[in-house]
């Protein structure tokens, strides 16, 4: 066993290609175990509220419908762009965090503020780089037919009908959301790690396990807090990504709802959802998201630190 290190805070000691590769590994690992939950979450976010049922029954209803009408493989629709999204996002997030950490360290910011700022910059960078894959994944997951959609055909359709902006629909809102998420996640993560480091020597021996548990849960706690705060913004972004789809009327029984979004920006769509569906609609899929956040964040940070440990041997 090796002693776990905080490679993010010590990123200036890690080569850029190692942080890039470790981030890709962590992203792919996280994606591989959460794809089905991700699909259900996106389906719930894309479906306007109509006599909302309890959160738990919503999840089961969507899952049963997918198995009955589309088959078990439906849970992995959009898996290719989803995997590319996670790999690209993971690589960009961790490598840019390490890079920004290196260049901002000389400014001598207070440790928690430093983590918050670096996390925000890392979030913006990773969002821009990976966003087209996010749009593709949302469009493919929205397909509720038995047959799968062609990725290349969807790319051509977006390019033909919407142009380059189509691949970045909702990206400004996404950068705001993801920047906030990254800031909260990394800020919480580093705050807990710093707290544990500072109290390690003064903590009584019989309470060491509590500190160790908190230390190992830092990434998960940060991910959960960030998800709860930013989930409504993510729901609005999903609606924006799907609203101009060529297959909107074919894949959704609520095309008129999406039609009412035409010409609206992020804030107006959010207000429209609040007015027509209520605040609970902005949290459709939150239980799935939180269930996904725990393994995703844990595997992401664990995978990154583990990969960095072994890459340092070479």
Curated annotation (Swiss-Prot):
Main location: mitochondrion
Recorded topology in the membrane: Multi-pass membrane protein
Key words of the record: Membrane, Mitochondrion, Mitochondrion inner membrane, Repeat, Transmembrane, Transmembrane helix, Transport
Solcar repeat placement: 14-103, 110-195, 210-310
Location of the protein in the cell: Mitochondrion inner membrane
GO biological process: transmembrane transport
Record protein name field: Mitochondrial thiamine pyrophosphate carrier 1
Organism encoding this protein: Saccharomyces cerevisiae (strain YJM789) (Baker's yeast)
Gene that this polypeptide is encoded by: TPC1
